[in-house]
Amino acid sequence: MSYRVALLIVVVTHLVGAVGLRTDFAQWMVLLTPVHLLVSFGLLFSFSSKSEFLKGALLAVFALGLLVEIIGVNSGYPFGSYVYLEGLGPKVLNTPWLIGVNWVMLTLASGSFAAQFLDNGSRLQRALLASGLMLVLDVLIEPVAHAHRLWIFAGGIAPWQNYLSWFIVALTAQWIVGKGLESNRLAGPILLAQAAFFALSWLWPIAF
């Protein structure tokens, strides 16, 4: 697939989601969240290096993300007390397995962008930048996820420990994949599309 076609798919899917969630079809659009996540990851990965190291590292990030989320959902640590509803599909120990894919996609996108932006930077500098980008996305995502009924925190709002723990786990994930990351032409557009999609929800409420 050409870069232009992939970029068009990224833009169109995010636009359709942004508009659709503000119509009478909002609840149906939420059901497409898993499909959108898998499509975005598939496109992003198709423009990655696909080295054996990177494949193994991404698998490790999947396991890390899913394990931490399973622990979090069932113990309230380290993210706080929260539960996943049905929007992200089938679950493993009360946790959607797709949340592991989400960790992989965000790690790959932000890490690849950092590798390009800090071309001569150290592994630590890249990891810190990428983790910071992931934290910014989480800040944007949390209230939208609550509105989508994807997951809900006790009290209706994510506690400060969620963001601290998110950054620590993100930094760990970035360190795991650090050696295998290269510039990815689709990383920037996907990060920008996601940031715009979630930021829009702060200005234009979802139709629920």
Indicate where each model-derived feature is located.
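Aromatic-rich, lipid-facing transmembrane alpha helices and their immediate juxtamembrane interface loops
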Residues: 1-208
